């Protein structure tokens, strides 16, 4: 055993011998196995990985399917459930898209059907996991200990010819004659039945009212008979002689056993076997239930009573008030009630009786409809899942039985689902066809394959689908109506033994499926046509192919179900049964002939003679058959109808009842008569499917094709032959059976009961007073019996020789109910008294007391812009400078400005630096105006800051204009200027349509603005900071020169980090750089950082941490900001005050400052990052005015936001947005056709209507909602579209209401996105796989995890130059721009001092390639080596290619260093490298190197380039000029944490092989534990009765 092997491995094998451990081990194994299965089944992986898993599970199944044993079967069941679990998890978590009500309804309907199918599969495996295969239990040797048994044969309207055989077979049962009573329960009250009963010696019982159909009939019989056990046979079920000997043994052995059911075997073919071409080779429909399901139910002590062929303990039925009458399936409901009271049930899988199948499909459907109604009634009225008394195993078995009859709607959904795509264009499974294939195929394959193995010879693959499809459309209405009104419906008797004079096609039975087949055929044509003639991409073609295949399979199933409707001719009154029996024939001359039968029937036999001699036809012979084992010895007269050498056909000559009895005994009495009921070939799914196809072919075979709505009627009888069935009087009557010894010379013993209210049987005299009479209608009050004072009724004449008649009973009034204490008084004989005593001794109960129950960088400068003269750039003078910029240079990156009738206003920003003033300005415009415009009414007006500049006139003959130059008054200019163009256009004189295509004007993006500016003398005060170093109006990259007299002093780096990150925070999205020099620049502004720097022109030294603005000695208009102090610590204090308290410095030029106190930072609290622990309002990210716009098509509104890139959501669940939109009130905008488009990072997300809520919703919102008047929409942000820096864009596209001709359309409308809309990232967890340099490029991660970089150590060489110091400041500026927080906590370490104080946080290496060898210790976990001016893969990564085979390959564009044979020179290149920290496994090292500081500077500047950032990935990036190459070579490690269940999902989601192995281990553990527990329970079930029997025998 597995657990023993594990304990032995752990050297704990002694524990295996401890009983408690041994008993608990299967449960531990099962718990672990279930956990592993749930873990493996609940993980969603990539489609490619799932394809590998699919191949593995299918291959394993093919490997194991040929192996025998229940252990293998249990494992394959678990494997099937594992695969199906994976499929359903994938369906529920990945493939549901509910974009429209129709799609939502269709998608959810299919998912519900699939969930039902999975539930049914699980319950089927549970039921059939371990068929008990119970064997008969021997009876006591002394027959005097055998109980009295009453055999009931209920009948209502069946033909007597059908009932005779059953009664004669029951009378022939091998049982002591004085302990066997056979009763005909005739609810039809027919005199012919009464006469037959008297003739045969059977009892005969009728009642005065037919309440509750069969159940009422049985309850009435219970009250007037006394046998300890009751056996029930339907009127067509003929028992074998050994029925009681094989069943009563278990009943006697187990006093708690209330029921022992045997199979219902049918010796005539059912409609599927008879009507389908291959039906005779297919197991009957009922074989699976009686051959497998019931045997499995017996294992769980949940055997169902099936209404016939069962032995029942009388006290058990009386204890529940009789047979159930609340539903039309009284049998199953009765068993349920007994089991609720604590009684046991059992099943013997040996057919001990045989009956007739329904002859026609319509009758079969009617019978199944009744069964379905009854089981659904039980579900609604007495649900086994609720109430007390049942064990959980029994509840599941009943749930399986009840839920089975809900199949109609799911079956119809499965058949019709492809119509949604082919006819309606609805994609109800939101996945690629390949994904559907790799998930759905193993689910279907394992289900079919495992069920084929389990069901074997009892049910063939694909035939369940045919059976269900035949019934589905009839059951849909029944299912719905019964669930809604469970008390509706009556018991209907199924006709048996009918004939068909001719073949016909029963349209009445198949017309719903004919209609469905026509629809499916049209869908098939649509699918084939779509694949062949419609244009689509590969994905659409695959969708068409998949749905066409689906509809083809559905059509095959439906056609097979239609083929069943072709009813074959049936003119044989007595069905034949194949049987080979040794017989002897004696002719009229006494000659004996030995023969063997080939088939037998109640009408005759076919036999093979052992001689070639041919007997003459019409010869009378006597057939002899002797079976000593079964006690059969018959002599039956017959006539030869057909004879040829070695073969003849005989017809029985039935002269009297004794001959008929012998015929029945010969055909049905043998104990092994039906032992071959399951002799079919084991199922093979492919062969079974071919049989289905051949059956469909039979639908089109030649023959008589008569289409009828009902069965053809037999020829009418002659008028003289019309004999109406004579009926007995509608009164109660009990005819006592005649013992076999008294049958000769006496016909019957007759008891006339004109009324039953005062009769009291001894067996019911002790009935509990609380019991309500079975005949009572539900809800009625039992009526007290009237006094017995009526005169006795007259006696019927008695035949001679009958037994004495008991006293007559006073009649009851019409409609009077039978009290619990009344019954028929039978003579008290020894057998009856013995039965009473035995009942009390063995069960401890009596009828009086029955057994009881129980989850700053911007876009780089455009290369097409005109170059700036270097001389102008370097010149510093008081003179004027003239610059010319195109509209494209000014930020118009989307092409020309286009003005339309509905969007007449467009513009752009013209920025003037704060240290300059405009002295002259002009604009030069070019473009085009629509030639259809009216010149006198159309023009484009130009304004600057709402000041008029000029007008562009329309010239229809020359649509193009320009260049046109307008001078602009310099006084119009401010810092941030709005240059606007307003279009006014008309194309006709009366009225114009704003949306007409002829209303347009375009301003070229190559139009120019020319400004002449001059510098302004600075006012050097600290309160103006960050001016003049930073101008917020400028959109160009920020360049801040820095003077560091001693860049090699590491102490100055922390102060420079504060300064650089502060400017980075200010610059935000613009690039910011810090060129470092050791001397003051020749011109412009600069920042000086160092110890003891002069703070004024006189050379005064600092007296403490000092900030001072002084004139650039080389440029009188330039300013130097000095940060100094007496030591490095004071310089750092000055920098910290500048970064955190610049607004408190005052209007002074120099100030000695005091340090500021900073609160400790927490992870992920950077001001730039959107909080992930609460919803965030849009108004927290941008001003409300930025989310408003005017006109029908206002400019795009942008919502930028930053996120930590390590956000991880459960299976990439999107993050919600609650979006509120405000639109104009009144009849201005056509809200039905207007929309709002939402984009995320330039990717389209969704479109939303502007239509407001209903009037009632709008009114109610105004009472309680702060968003009253706004329209709410729900959107979602997919995680794969989110990065460190993100931008949501909102584009309104409104349409004006059509006001008719010459009605003015307002154009001054406003629309907005409410600033109280919010984003919500609370479902995200911080978890990332590192190294990932894309995270570093997007958001400086993992260093930005702490906003102040307090867990970051920058390691630099012992000696650094100004270039390296400048790169360091560039990098700190990048961090500040990313986090919007100065780097107050960053640590700077000398590589020489690192061994003494190794950093515990994240490490950033900054060095040139020449210093790379000094950093080898920090890069020991990197897969690369930097030696000899080259970077190559280290020797320790020689086996890296093997790892690469199993890693996740979702990183597009990445190369593997091993496979690429990386060996690149570093000369002229920059290197960005990520690795795991050598000091902590959850920390990172990022190295930024280059052969020169300028290469390092280029690498840092690339981190703020929108062109470069997407190309920075993996764990290594090489930059050569503008070319970036990314590599991923080393395995990744993780940073952050997840809940354990999410971590398992993530871990297995990227490791399909591990998932596969864990799933198999889990399935194996569950299977091993299940086999052990099931085997133990099977032994207990079979030994329990034997132990009780031994105990009882010992007590006697």
UniProtKB/Swiss-Prot annotation:
It catalyses: [(1->4)-beta-D-glucosyl](n) + UDP-alpha-D-glucose = [(1->4)-beta-D-glucosyl](n+1) + UDP + H(+). It holds the Pfam family Glyco_trans_2_3. Residues 1-749 are annotated as: Catalytic. The keyword Transmembrane applies. InterPro entries: Cell_synth_A (IPR003919), Cell_synth_B (IPR003920), Cell_synthase_bac (IPR018513), Glyco_trans_2-like (IPR001173), Glycosyltr_2/OpgH_subfam (IPR050321), Nucleotide-diphossugar_trans (IPR029044), PilZ_domain (IPR009875). It is an enzyme of class 2 (transferase). This is Cellulose synthase 2. It comes from Novacetimonas hansenii (Komagataeibacter hansenii). Its main location: membrane. GO terms for cellular component: plasma membrane. Keywords: Cell inner membrane, Cell membrane, Cellulose biosynthesis, Glycosyltransferase, Membrane, Transferase, Transmembrane, Transmembrane helix. Its EC number is 2.4.1.12. One of its GO terms (molecular function) is cellulose synthase (UDP-forming) activity. The active site is at 187, 331. It is a multi-pass membrane protein. Substrate binds at residues 234, 236. Residues 783-809 have a biased composition (Pro residues). NCBIfam families: CelA. The chain crosses the membrane at residues 25-45, 106-126, 396-416, 421-441, 505-525, 544-564, 1553-1573. It is not essential for cellulose production in this strain.
């Amino acid at each position: 055993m597995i657990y023993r092997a594990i304990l032995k491995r752990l050297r704990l094998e002694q524990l295996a011998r401890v009983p408690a451990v041994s008993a608990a081990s299967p449960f531990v194994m099962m718990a672990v196995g279930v956990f592993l299965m749930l873990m493996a089944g609940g993980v969603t992986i990539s489609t490619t990985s799932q394809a590998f898993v699919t191949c593995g599970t299918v291959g394993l199944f093919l490997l194991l399917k040929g192996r025998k044993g229940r252990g293998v079967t249990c494992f394959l069941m678990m494997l099937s459930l594992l695969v199906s679990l994976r499929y359903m998890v994938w369906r529920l978590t990945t493939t549901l898209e509910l974009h429209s009500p129709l799609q939502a309804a269709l998608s959810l309907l299919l998912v519900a059907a699939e969930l039902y199918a999975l539930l049914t599969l699980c319950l089927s495996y549970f039921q059939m996991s371990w068929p008990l295969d119970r064997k008969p239990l021997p009876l006591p040797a002394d027959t005097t200990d055998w109980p009295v048994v009453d055999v009931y044969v209920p009948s209502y309207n069946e033909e007597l010819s059908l009932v005779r055989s059953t009664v004669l077979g029951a009378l022939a049962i091998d049982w002591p004659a004085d302990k066997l009573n056979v009763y005909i329960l005739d609810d039809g009250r027919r005199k012919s039945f009464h006469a037959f009963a008297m003739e045969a010696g059977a009892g005969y019982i009728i009642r005065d009212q037919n309440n509750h159909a069969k159940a009422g009939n049985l309850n009435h019989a219970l009250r007037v008979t006394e046998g300890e056990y009751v056996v029930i046979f339907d009127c067509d079920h003929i028992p074998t002689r050994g029925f009681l000997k094989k069943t009563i043994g278990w009943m006697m052995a187990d006093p708690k056993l209330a029921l022992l059911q045997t199979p219902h075997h049918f010796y005539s073919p059912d409609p599927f076997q008879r009507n389908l071409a291959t039906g005779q080779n297919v197991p009957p429909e009922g074989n699976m239930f009686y051959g497998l399901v019931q045997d499995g139910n017996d294992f769980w002590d949940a055997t169902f009573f099936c209404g016939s062929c069962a032995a029942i303990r009388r006290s058990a039925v009386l204890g529940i008030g009789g047979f159930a009458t609340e539903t039309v399936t009284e049998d199953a409901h009765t068993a349920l009630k007994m089991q609720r009271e604590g009684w046991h049930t059992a099943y013997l899988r040996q057919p001990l009786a045989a009956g007739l199948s329904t002859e026609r499909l319509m009758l079969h459907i009617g019978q199944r409809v009744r069964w379905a109604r009854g089981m659904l009634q039980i579900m609604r009225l007495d649900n086994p899942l609720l109430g007390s008394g049942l064990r959980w195993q029994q509840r599941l078995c009943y749930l399986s039985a009840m839920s089975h009859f809900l199949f109609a709607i799911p079956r119809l959904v499965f058949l019709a689902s492809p119509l949604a795509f082919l006819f309606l264009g609805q994609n109800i499974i939101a996945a690629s066809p390949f994904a559907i294939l790799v998930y759905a195929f193993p689910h279907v394959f394992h289900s079919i394959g495992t069920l084929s193995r389990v069901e074997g010879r009892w049910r063939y693959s694909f035939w369940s689908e045919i059976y269900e499809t035949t019934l589905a459309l009839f059951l849909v209405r029944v299912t719905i109506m019964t669930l809604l009104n469970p008390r509706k419906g009556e018991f209907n008797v199924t006709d048996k033994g009918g004939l068909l004079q001719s073949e016909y096609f029963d349209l009445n039975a198949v017309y719903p499926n004919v209609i469905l087949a026509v629809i499916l055929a049209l869908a098939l044509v649509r699918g084939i046509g779509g694949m062949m003639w419609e244009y689509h991409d590969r994905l659409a073609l695959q969708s068409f192919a998949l749905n066409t295949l689906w509809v083809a399979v559905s059509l095959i199933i439906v056609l097979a179900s239609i083929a069943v409707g072709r009813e074959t001719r049936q003119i044989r009154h007595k069905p034949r049964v194949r049987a080979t029996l040794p017989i002897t024939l004696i002719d009229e001359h006494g000659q004996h002939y030995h023969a063997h039968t080939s088939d037998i029937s109640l009408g005759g036999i076919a036999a093979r003679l052992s001689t070639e001699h041919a007997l003459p036809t019409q010869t009378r012979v006597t057939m002899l058959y002797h079976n000593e084992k079964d006690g059969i010895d018959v002599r039956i007269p017959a006539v030869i109808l057909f004879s040829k050498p070695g073969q003849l056909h005989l017809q029985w000559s039935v002269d009297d009842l004794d001959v008929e009895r012998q015929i029945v005994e010969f055909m049905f009495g043998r104990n092994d008569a039906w032992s071959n009921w399951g002799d079919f070939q084991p199922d093979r799914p492919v062969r079974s499917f071919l049989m289905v196809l051949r059956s469909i072919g039979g639908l089109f075979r030649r023959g008589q094709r008569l289409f009828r709505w009902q069965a053809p009627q037999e020829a009418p009888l002659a008028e003289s032959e019309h004999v109406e069935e004579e009926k007995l009087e509608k009164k109660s009557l009990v005819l006592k059976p005649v013992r076999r010894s008294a049958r000769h010379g006496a016909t019957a013993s007759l008891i006339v009961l004109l009324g039953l209210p005062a009769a009291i049987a001894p067996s019911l005299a002790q009935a509990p007073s609380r019991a309500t009479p079975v005949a009572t209608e539900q809800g009625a009050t039992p009526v007290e019996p009237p006094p017995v004072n009526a005169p006795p009724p007259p006696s019927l004449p008695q035949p001679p020789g009958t037994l004495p008649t008991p006293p007559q009973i006073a009649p009851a009034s019409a409609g009077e109910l039978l009290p619990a204490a009344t019954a028929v008084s039978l003579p008290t004989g020894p057998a009856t008294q013995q039965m009473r005593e035995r009942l009390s001794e063995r069960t401890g109960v009596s009828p009086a007391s029955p057994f009881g129950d129980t989850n700053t960088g911007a876009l780089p400068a455009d290369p097409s812009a005109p170059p700036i003269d270097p001389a102008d750039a370097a010149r510093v003078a008081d003179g004027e400078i003239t610059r010319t910029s195109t509209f494209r240079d000014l930020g118009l990156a989307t092409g020309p400005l286009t003005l339309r009738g509905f969007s007449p206003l467009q513009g752009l920003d013209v920025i003037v630096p704060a240290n300059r003033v405009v002295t002259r300005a002009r604009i030069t415009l070019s473009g085009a105006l629509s030639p259809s415009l009216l010149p006198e009414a159309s023009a484009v007006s130009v304004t600057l800051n709402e000041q008029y500049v000029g007008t562009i006139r329309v010239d229809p003959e020359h649509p193009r204009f320009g260049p046109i130059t307008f001078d602009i008054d310099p006084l119009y200019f401010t810092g941030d200027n709005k240059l606007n163009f307003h279009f006014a256009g008309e194309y006709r004189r009366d009225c114009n349509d704003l949306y007409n295509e002829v209303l347009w004007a375009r301003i070229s993006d190559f139009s120019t603005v020319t400004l002449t500016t001059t510098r302004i003398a600075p006012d050097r005060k600290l309160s103006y900071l960050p001016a003049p170093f930073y101008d917020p109006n400028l959109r160009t990259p920020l360049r801040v020169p820095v003077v560091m007299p001693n860049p090699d002093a590491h102490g100055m780096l922390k102060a420079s980090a504060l300064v650089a990150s502060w400017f980075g925070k200010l610059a935000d999205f613009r690039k910011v750089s810090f060129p470092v020099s050791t001397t003051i620049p020749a011109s412009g502004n600069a920042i000086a950082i160092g110890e003891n720097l002069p703070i004024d022109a006189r050379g005064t030294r600092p007296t403490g941490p000092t900030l001072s603005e002084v004139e650039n000695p080389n440029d009188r208009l330039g300013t130097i900001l000095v940060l100094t102090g007496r030591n490095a610590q004071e310089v750092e204090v000055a920098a910290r005050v500048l970064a955190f308290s610049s607004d408190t410095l005052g209007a002074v030029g120099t100030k000695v400052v005091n340090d500021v106190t900073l609160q400790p930072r927490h992870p992920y609290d950077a001001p730039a990052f959107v909080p992930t622990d609460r919803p965030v309002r849009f108004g927290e990210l941008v001003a409300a005015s930025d989310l408003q716009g005017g006109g029908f098509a206002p400019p795009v509104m942008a919502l930028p936001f930053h996120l930590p890139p390590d956000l991880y959501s459960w299976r990439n669940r999107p993050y919600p947005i609650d979006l509120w939109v405000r639109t104009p009130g009144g009849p201005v905008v056509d809200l039905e056709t207007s929309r709002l488009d939402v984009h995320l990072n330039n990717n389209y997300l969704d479109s939303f209507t502007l239509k407001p809520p209903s009037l009632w919703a709008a009114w109610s919102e105004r009472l309680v909602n702060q968003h009253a008047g706004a329209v709410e929409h729900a959107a979602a942000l997919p995680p794969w579209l989110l990065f460190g820096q993100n931008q949501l864009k909102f584009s309104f596209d409104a349409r004006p209401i059509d006001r008719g001709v010459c009605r003015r359309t307002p154009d001054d409308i406003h629309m907005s996105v409410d600033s109280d809309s919010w984003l919500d990232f609370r479902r995200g967890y911080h978890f990332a796989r590192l190294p990932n340099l894309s995270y570093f490029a997007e958001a400086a991660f993992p260093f930005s995890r702490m906003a102040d970089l307090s867990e970051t150590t920058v390691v630099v060489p012992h000696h650094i130059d100004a270039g390296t110091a400048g790169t360091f400041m560039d990098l700190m500026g990048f961090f500040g721009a990313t986090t919007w927080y100065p780097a107050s906590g960053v640590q700077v370490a000398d590589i020489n001092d690192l061994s003494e104080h190794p950093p515990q946080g994240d490490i950033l290496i900054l060095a040139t390639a020449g210093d790379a060898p000094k950093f080898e210790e920090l890069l020991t976990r990197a897969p690369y080596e930097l030696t000899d001016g080259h970077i190559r893969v280290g020797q320790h990564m020689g086996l890296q290619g093997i790892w690469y085979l199993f890693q996740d390959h979702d990183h597009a564009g990445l190369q593997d260093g091993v496979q690429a044979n990386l060996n690149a020179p570093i000369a002229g290149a920059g290197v960005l490298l990520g690795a795991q920290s050598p000091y902590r496994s959850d920390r990172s090292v990022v190295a930024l190197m280059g052969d020169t500081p300028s290469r390092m500077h280029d690498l840092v500047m690339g981190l703020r380039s929108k062109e470069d950032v997407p190309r920075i990935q993996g764990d290594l990036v090489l930059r050569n000029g503008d070319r970036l190459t990314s590599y991923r070579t080393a395995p990744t490690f993780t940073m952050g944490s997840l809940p354990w269940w999410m971590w398992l999902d993530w871990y297995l989601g990227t490791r399909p092989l591990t998932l596969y192995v864990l799933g198999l281990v889990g399935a194996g553990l569950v299977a091993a534990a299940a086999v052990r527990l099931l085997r133990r329970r099977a032994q207990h079930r079979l030994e329990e009765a034997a132990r009780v029997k031994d105990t009882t025998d010992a007590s006697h």
